[in-house]
């Protein structure tokens, strides 16, 4: 059977969706910096936003595994259209979301001090958001697994636009911080109208997976361990950074804003194309490292060019959009942060390859190593900017090295010959029951 590839129009739709998402995220950050006080902006930008999207990042393991499971099921049986498990993938995702929400509520006394304003409501909003996002991630993953790329793009751009519109509504209604926080989480409801009012959405909702519900859940939980590491480096980093620094000045707020604006141009499109990447790697398992090399070189090239632009014109643009923090984002800092975003992106691509090869343990190992090093380096006695640059450069390089070494040692590496005697990096093969 010939493998379906993503067409130019589908790629354009996904790219356009990622541009909308990046632009909406940037716009929300600028709006928050303008309308919120320094203390409110610090809570929103360095506590609520990174924590929410850090937890969303962990929950995003549902999307990755659903893409693999649905895509693998279609490769095995192209006519497959309905699941054969007692629980659908979306029901399993919802249950996992409820479990994460329960953990959020139970652990909130340990971290809710980061929200001096509306602490209880902030916890409730996060718990609600994670349940809705779990289902959103499952539907998005299933659409990628089925190669329903226009629907996939609509989900991504729709969520971002709803978040932006809700933020503007909060400004017009003078809801301030609580309104901004509410706007962040309500966007995850986008999956509901997309499934109810779209034929494609309905078919995606009833997609089948290649393993049992129990194995599907186990795979997701394992991926969540590594997704926690990914969240530390990508979305939740400012939350952990504020716990290791006593800096309450505007410089810290400027650094957090700079991390966001230098990351979005690379990471937002990459996150939008993760489903495409996993789907493509699934279809090129005979030469996995060759399939990985090209996108990595592209990402690093874009990162280098972006770093040059950030150095030359970044401070000027930053001062325009973040006028409250003018003069606090030098060009060298913006350039380093931009290129380090490309390094993180390379780690994300390597992780996607590990998932496509069904090497979940290796995926976990890479991200856990990166996260552990990041948390360790956060305590190095340097100024906050130097410490941030050290963490965001060294940690993803460590994780990428672990994953690359694991693939080379596995029988799924380029040579096709295994040098891994321990079996550490190989998942157990699915049983007949797990494929039912």
Predicted regions located by residue number:
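Interhelical loop/hinge segments that connect adjacent transmembrane helices in multipass membrane
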Residues: 1-7, 150-154, 177-178, 183-184, ...
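Signature of the first transmembrane helix
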Residues: 6-63, 221-244, 396-398
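Interfacial transmembrane-helix starts/ends
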Residues: 8, 45, 78-94, 217-220, ...
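Transmembrane helical elements of multi-pass membrane transporters/channels
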Residues: 10-25, 158-159, 163, 180-195, ...
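Interfacial segments at transmembrane-helix termini and the short loops linking adjacent helices
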Residues: 38, 107-126, 312-342
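Helix-loop junctions and terminal segments of transmembrane helices
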Residues: 59-76, 258, 262-286, 355-356
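Hydrophobic alpha-helical transmembrane segments
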Residues: 119-124, 153-201, 369-373, 385-411
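Membrane-interface junctions at transmembrane-helix termini in multi-pass inner-membrane proteins
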Residues: 132-154, 168, 339-366
């Amino acid at each position: 059977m010939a493998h379906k590839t993503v067409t130019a129009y589908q790629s354009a739709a996904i790219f356009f969706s990622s541009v909308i998402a990046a632009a909406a995220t940037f716009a929300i950050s600028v709006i928050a910096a303008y309308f919120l006080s320094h203390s409110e902006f610090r809570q929103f930008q360095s506590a609520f936003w990174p924590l929410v999207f850090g937890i969303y990042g962990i929950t995003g393991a549902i999307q990755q595994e659903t893409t693999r499971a649905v895509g693998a099921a279609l490769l095995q049986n192209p006519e497959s259209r309905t699941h054969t498990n007692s629980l659908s993938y979306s029901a399993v995702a919802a249950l996992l979301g409820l479990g994460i929400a329960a953990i959020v509520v139970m652990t909130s006394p340990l971290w809710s001090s980061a929200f001096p304003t509306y602490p209880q409501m902030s916890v409730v909003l996060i718990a609600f958001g994670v349940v809705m996002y779990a289902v959103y991630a499952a539907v998005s993953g299933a659409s990628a697994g089925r190669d329903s790329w226009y629907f996939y793009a609509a989900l991504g751009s729709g969520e971002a636009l709803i978040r932006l519109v809700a933020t503007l509504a909060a400004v017009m209604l003078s809801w301030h911080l609580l309104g901004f926080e509410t706007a962040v989480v309500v966007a995850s409801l986008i999956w509901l109208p997309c499934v109810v009012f779209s034929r494609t959405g309905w078919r995606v909702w009833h997609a089948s997976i290649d393993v049992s519900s129990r194995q599907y859940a186990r795979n997701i939980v394992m991926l969540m361990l590594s997704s926690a590491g990914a969240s530390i480096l990508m979305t939740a980093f400012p939350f952990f950074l504020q716990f290791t620094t006593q800096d309450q000045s505007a410089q810290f707020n400027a650094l957090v804003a700079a991390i966001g604006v230098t990351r979005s141009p690379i990471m937002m499109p990459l996150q939008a194309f993760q489903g495409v990447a996993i789907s493509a790697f699934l279809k090129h398992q005979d030469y996995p490292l060759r399939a990985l090399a090209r996108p990595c070189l592209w990402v690093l090239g874009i990162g280098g060019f972006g770093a040059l632009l950030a150095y030359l014109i970044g401070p000027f643009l930053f001062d325009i959009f973040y006028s409250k923090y003018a003069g606090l984002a030098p060009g060298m800092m913006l350039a380093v942060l931009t290129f380090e975003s490309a390094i993180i992106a390379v780690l994300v691509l390597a992780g996607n390859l590990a998932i496509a090869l069904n090497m979940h343990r290796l995926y976990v190992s890479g991200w856990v190593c990166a996260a552990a090093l990041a948390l360790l380096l956060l305590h190095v006695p340097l100024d906050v900017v130097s410490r941030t640059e050290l963490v965001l450069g060294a940690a993803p390089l460590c994780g990428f090295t672990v994953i690359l070494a694991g693939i080379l040692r596995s029988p799924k590496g380029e040579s096709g010959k295994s040098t891994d005697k321990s079996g550490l990096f190989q998942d157990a093969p699915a049983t007949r029951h797990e494929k039912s």
